[in-house]
Amino acid sequence: MLELFFEYIFPLIIIALKVVAITIPLILCVAYLTYAERRVIGLMQLRRGPNVVGPFGLLQPIADAVKLLFKEPIIPTNADKILFILAPMITFILSLIGWAVIPFAKGVVLADINVGVLYILAISSLSVYGIIIAGWASNSKYAFLGAIRSSAQMISYEVSMGLVIITVLLTTGTLNLSEIIEAQRTIPWWIDLMLLPMGVVFFISVLAETNRLPFDLPEAESELVAGYNVEYSSMGFALFFLGEYANMILVSAMTTTFFLGGYLPPFNISWLDCIPGFFWFVFKVGFLLFCFLWIRATLPRYRYDQLMRLGWKVFLPLTLFWVVLVSSVLVYTDNLPSI
């Protein structure tokens, strides 16, 4: 009986504890990211932001959570009730399970699989389903238009993101995210410089992927009231909200992993290795999240035709050309990694 416990049940308990250890801090990070957003944008707009609930307004996310928890969930009369309820759950769950393959520090990863990049791409592609289901099930023209915009936008920029990731795979020679980070220790500086434009393209693409300004067309308040989640209240709205901000943190972690060295120090200086890798990972993700907030506070929204033109007529040809350029240079200089 004891052997059965240690062979089958104990590993499941360990996995469950790991999942809880990632999920609870992530939800807390999402909650306080909303607080940070309001404070940062407030400072940029010369106002104070939330400062009443608790010292410096630090309890504001808890107050917001309690408010949403006790609000009445209202389902439209003609809505498809089952899909209407499932849609925010799908969005929120998909935003969490993407973290399974992200390395927080050396050896600190829930599932260190050899196809981590494919897993991340698959999960990010699936996230559009929660939004399109919400728009369809709401039986509202505003929600449906927002959902169609979102699906078209996410599919358009997925192509560019995939091609950008191919350039990273060409230089590292692996689909394992931990090995991609370790490969960045030894990559020559000129290859890093060659990948820099692709890092910028990737970051702009994930702005569109997460429906953030200046690409928040699916939620355009002046055109679609609130987009695909216009009919949601209470916990349904809260789950969409949590999913959006969890996706922001996830894509920041992806950008850090692919282009900023993950948990590695930013410079090859011996004393920087004394600082734990987790600190560097959090620092880099935090910097990218600040860029998200900075962009929201300063840039206006794109028109929809401008958004599509940027994706299909600028980013797609550019990333295709860069894949050919990187592969040609790696072959010519004999730096193509063995897979």
From Swiss-Prot:
One biological process term from GO is: aerobic respiration
Instruction: Cite the EC number.
Output: 7.1.1.-
Keywords tagged on the record: Cell inner membrane, Cell membrane, Membrane, NAD, Quinone, Translocase, Transmembrane, Transmembrane helix, Ubiquinone
Q: Name one GO cellular component term.
A: plasma membrane
* One Pfam family recorded for the sequence: NADHdh
EC class name: translocase
Report the catalytic activity.
a quinone + NADH + 5 H(+)(in) = a quinol + NAD(+) + 4 H(+)(out)
Family of this protein: Belongs to the complex I subunit 1 family.
User: What does it do?
Assistant: NDH-1 shuttles electrons from NADH, via FMN and iron-sulfur (Fe-S) centers, to quinones in the respiratory chain. The immediate electron acceptor for the enzyme in this species is believed to be ubiquinone. Couples the redox reaction to proton translocation (for every two electrons transferred, four hydrogen ions are translocated across the cytoplasmic membrane), and thus conserves the redox energy in a proton gradient. This subunit may bind ubiquinone.
Kindly provide the name given to this protein in its UniProt entry: NADH-quinone oxidoreductase subunit H
